[in-house]
């Protein structure tokens, strides 16, 4: 007898959505939450990403805040690492620590149907 498919957890769905962001593009915590169907869960997206192991294949660095800035503060060099990784993908930050969202922002295709099928 086949087991019924379990719906992916919120955290797993966050990871699946973030994996769709191509190199050189960025998204926001709110954009990820909106792609999952609830833009009010931006903070939970951040928590999910902060739980990733260091050897992950999820491109966490491509998720920034809605002001175009990196949100990590005082986390053992994570902000510097994120900025370095994004820089290697062609994402530049200005003197205020912000990137141009209108240039680099990834607009999701409608992912809800595909994610709900899992």
Identify what each model region corresponds to:
Residues 1-118:
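Nucleic acid-binding interface residues in structured DNA/RNA-binding domains
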């Amino acid at each position: 007898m086949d087991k019924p498919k379990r719906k992916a957890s919120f955290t797993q769905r966050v990871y699946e959505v973030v994996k769709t962001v191509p190199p050189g593009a960025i998204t926001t915590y709110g954009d990820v939450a909106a792609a999952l169907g609830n833009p009010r869960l931006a903070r939970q997206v951040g928590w999910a990403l902060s739980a990733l192991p260091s050897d992950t294949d999820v491109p966490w660095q491509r998720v920034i805040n809605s002001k175009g800035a990196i949100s990590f503060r005082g986390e053992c060099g994570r902000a510097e690492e994120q900025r370095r990784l994004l820089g290697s993908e062609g994402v530049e930050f200005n003197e205020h620590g912000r990137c141009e969202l209108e240039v680099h922002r990834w607009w999701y295709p409608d992912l809800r149907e595909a994610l709900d099928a899992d």
